[in-house]
Amino acid sequence: MEFLLGNPFSTPVGQCLEKATDGSLQSEDWTLNMEICDIINETEEGPKDAIRALKKRLSGNRNYREVMLALTVLETCVKNCGHRFHLLVANRDFIDSVLVKIISPKNNPPTIVQDKVLALIQAWADAFRSSPDLTGVVHIYEELKRRGIEFPMADLDALSPIHTPQRSVPEMDPAATIPRSQTQPRTTAGTYSSPPPASYSTLQAPALSVTGPITANSEQIARLRSELDIVRGNTKVMSEMLTEMVPGQEDSSDLELLQELNRTCRAMQHRIVELISRVSNEEVTEELLHVNDDLNNVFLRYERFERYRSGRSVQNASNGVLSEVTEDNLIDLGPGSPAVVSPMVGSTAPPSSLSSQLAGLDLGTESVSGTLSSLQQCKPQDGFDMFAQTRGNSLAEQRKTVTYEDPQAVGGLASALDNRKQNSEMIPVAQPSVMDDIEVWLRTDLKGDDLEEGVTSEEFDKFLEERAKAAETVPDLPSPPTEAPAPASNTSTRKKPERSDDALFAL
C-alpha cells in the first residue's frame, strides 16, 4: 500500500507531522501543530494525508515519546479542523486498528499513554454521539466499557470543546487554494510568526469575565516564566509520586505531601486559566496552555489514585472485621484464652464431683434410664472438670481412702464397683450377648449345607423348611443358652448385680 500511495511523510502535511512528532523534541511544538491544522483545513487532500501520516507514526511504534506527541497532534487537529477530518478520525476502522491497538496488553504501553488514548476515545464519543455519520467511535467506546475497560475521569469544564466554532473569516474553497509549499518555501519552527487561527484562541479561552487584555513587558514575562517553571516542577514531582506510590500501601507522610501538592497545583491552575484569557502575548499564551494541559493530566491521575485508594481502604476494613470474627470463633486452649477462662468467671458454687454423684446412684434399678435419672444436672464444662479430677487418682489410691462401713459413702467409680462386688459375695459372670445367640442360631444345622448357583424351586422350598425347623429349635433371645455353666440355685441372686453392673458401664 505504501508503494502505491507513496511515503505518508512526503506530503506537505506529512512533513510537518513528522517534524512535530520527532522524539528528540523536549516538548510539543505548537507552531507546527497549528500549521498542520491550517494545511488540513485549506487543502483538498489534507485530511487524508494527515490520517495516513498519523497511522504511520502510531502503528507499531514502541517509541512512546513519539506516540504521545502524535496523540497531541491528533487531539489538536480534531479540535481545530472541520467535518471532513472528523469523518476520518471517528471512523471505526481508524479507532479500532490504530488507537485500540496501542493500548492492547501485548504492547504493554505506559500508563500515561493508556490514559491519553482512553481520554481521547471518551471525549470523542461524547462529542460525536449526536452525529449519525460519526458514531463509529461511539460503538468502540461502548464495546470497551462492556469489556470492563476503566476510562479516566474527565473534567468537562476544563476541557476544550470538540466542535470548532464558526470562523470569523470566511473559509476559502479548498480546490482554489494553492498549497503554501508551492508558492513559498516552508519556514522553520523558529522563524514561523503567523498567528494561529481565530478558532484556536477562541477554543482555549474559558468563558470568564475578561476585564481587558494584559500587555506584559519583558520583566513581567520573565517573572511569569519563572513562576511557570515552579508550576512545572510541582507537576513533575506530583506525577512521579503518582507513578511510584501504590494505592492502599502509601506512607502517611507521602500521602500528605501528595495532597498538599494537589491543593497547590489547583490554586495555580486557577491563576493560569485567568491569565490565558487576558495575556495578549502569543508565546506566553502557548506556554500557559501547555502548563494547563499538564495540570489537567496530573489531576486526572490523582483522581484515579484517590478512587483506588478509597476502594482499597474499604476492602481492608471489611477484611479486618471478618478476620476479627473468625479469630473469636476459633478454639484456643492457651493459658490466657477466653475460651478457657470465660466459663469459670462468675461461678458461685463449685460443681459437684463425679464421686459424689456416683455415690447417689440407685444401683438397684432394673433399667439404664432409671440409673441416669438419678444423676444431677450439670454443665458440660463441669463434667469435663470432674473427669479431669478423677483421672488424677489411681485405682489403688482410691481404694485406700474408702471405708466400707457405709455403702453410700464411696469415693469413686472403682470403689463403688468394688463395694458392690463384696456385698454380693459373688464373682460376676460374663453375660452372653445377643450376637452370641445369633451366631449359635446361624451355625445350627448349616455346617454342611452349601448352596450352589443353580437351585430349583423344589430345593429352595426344602431349604426354607429346614430353616423354619432350625428356628424352632433355637431358644428365646432374652434367656441365656442352655449350655451356660451357671448353677440354677444362684441364678436369682446373680441376675440383679449383673444388670446393675451393665447399667453402670452403660453410663
Curated annotation (Swiss-Prot):
The modification Phosphothreonine is found at T164. Transmembrane segments: none annotated. Ubiquitously expressed. Splicing pattern displays tissue specific variation. Residues 219-307 form the GAT domain. The modification Phosphoserine is found at S160. The keyword Repeat does not apply. GO terms for molecular function: clathrin binding; phosphatidylinositol binding; protein kinase binding; ubiquitin binding. Residues 498-507 have a biased composition (Basic and acidic residues). It holds the Pfam family GAT. The keyword Transport applies. Residues 164-200, 466-507 are annotated as: Disordered. Residues 20-152 form the VHS domain. The GAT domain mediates interaction with TOLLIP. Acts as a MYO6/Myosin VI adapter protein that targets myosin VI to endocytic structures. May also play a role in recruiting clathrin to endosomes. May regulate growth factor-induced mitogenic signaling. Belongs to the TOM1 family. This is TOM1-like protein 2.
